[in-house]
């Protein structure tokens, strides 16, 4: 997910996207632990997407305060 796409989301959308990404990260970690994950680079991209969304949430909360 690109930073521009995250910035277009509202606060509720960002929080919903964060939950989706955290669930995906959990599934990927479990697949990696059991040796079923083919694209291990996906772990890195999901982790970075989570960071982007969390940053956007912080910025949006500070803007509303």
Swiss-Prot record:
Annotated HAMAP family: Ribosomal_uL29
N-terminal signal peptide: none
Protein name from the UniProt record: Large ribosomal subunit protein uL29
Keyword match Repeat: no
CDD domains: Ribosomal_L29_HIP
This protein's UniProt keywords: Ribonucleoprotein, Ribosomal protein
GO molecular function: structural constituent of ribosome
GO cellular component annotations of the record: ribonucleoprotein complex; ribosome
Family from the record: Belongs to the universal ribosomal protein uL29 family.
Keyword Ribonucleoprotein assigned: yes
UniProt-listed PROSITE patterns: RIBOSOMAL_L29 (PS00579)
Species name: Acidithiobacillus ferrooxidans (strain ATCC 23270 / DSM 14882 / CIP 104768 / NCIMB 8455) (Ferrobacillus ferrooxidans (strain ATCC 23270))
GO biological processes: translation
